[in-house]
Amino acid sequence: MSSGTKHTMEELLRRKAKKITDPAGREVRILEDAEATALAHHCRSSRHAVYEKAMALGICPFRYLRNRDIVSIEEQLRLAKSRVVVIGAGGLGGHVVLLLARMGIGHLIVVDYDRFDETNLNRQALSTSASLGRSKSQTAVEAIGAINPGVEATPYEIKLDATNAFQILDGADAVVDALDNVPDRLLLEKATKKLGIPLVHGALAGFEGQVMTIFPEDPGLRYLYGKGGSRIDKSKSPESVMGVPTFTPALIATLQAMEVLKIILGRGRIFRNAMLYVDMETGRISEFSFENR
């Protein structure tokens, strides 16, 4: 985009921004979705670029108005500039990408080689009768675009492995583990540690689930699976043995998305060297600390 176009976009944003009174009675400048779309077309730019420029000028995209009391416009801009990779677009990952898209994460990369089948319909947010047989990663990206065109989303319809992990993960501010087996999680953890990227782990089985955030210098999944985790038979995973009902992925994915938010904004208490464990059937929520172990 030329400097002249940038100047034009800034001028148009100031002109198109509306002053409204928010639900708390405060005056705020907002940019409505239709105006953002028209401006992106006029400037031959993306909706993402328009939102970023608007927030840099203190103009709140109308879709983020209800975020303002808990997330400042400066923090919302930081989210828009962030890049998050979600590995897996099934039970956990499908919910995670939708939540992060609504929150305004600027760049989402979705990695999943699988396709939807009927057994996914009970729990996976992106699974519908219409999506059966379709690529999970591609379906996720289409859903992200429908929810928030201000998010730049990229699908990878491949299985993450040692040959492609670094290329896919490089440059991310956070990576979400939405996998369903231990060997793949350990491979992912190894790659994120080498790249210096925080990893948000999530796992579930039955009505139980867990969340933990792993920074590069942390022992991480060794706390949970020991040193022999890579030899665990995928067919004997808790998910395979106990099944995964409807509610568990939605809750654990929400906790994972919140960990991503805390990492990017540098606020709140992250579950680092600690695991949050939830048993939805009993209503028990526990935290296990791994400090000094």
Where are these regions (language model features)?
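Hydrophobic residues within alpha-helices
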Residues: V96-V97, A140, L188
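Glycine-rich adenosine-cofactor-binding loop
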Residues: L77-R115, A253
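S-adenosyl-L-methionine
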Residues: E142-A162
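Conserved anion/nucleotide-ligand pocket segment
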Residues: P238-L276
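E1/E1-like adenylate-forming module used to activate ubiquitin-like modifiers
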Residues: S2-A34, P155, L160-D161, F166-Q167, ...
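N-terminal charged helix/coil linker that caps or initiates catalytic domains
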Residues: S2-V84
